[in-house]
Amino acid sequence: MMNNQKLPSWLTIDADCALIQLSRPATCNGVVLDRLRMRAPTVRDVRTAHKTAGGDEADRELQLFASLLEVGQKDLEELKLVDYQRLQTAYFRLVEDDGGFAGAAA
């Protein structure tokens, strides 16, 4: 399904990653950052997060995002809610299939 919605000004997406501008600086891995880079997930990323979360969907998402962002889970728990919601939006936009890959083989 094609999504024609305009991206928010705080979000940049390409085929491999999303760059998320935070509403305020946050400390991740001991470094103060004003944006985070989320790489596109693999099937392995999703399966690993699902296995280690033990059925807890919120924990599964935190583990998955921590892996994709290469930050600690505790760092994500310290984000302001608005910034965590930006991560959620970025994730769903990143995995969305818009059918637009021109190099796909038939």
Show which residues each predicted segment covers.
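Short, surface-exposed, charged amphipathic helix/loop patches that serve as local interaction elements
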Residues: M2-A106
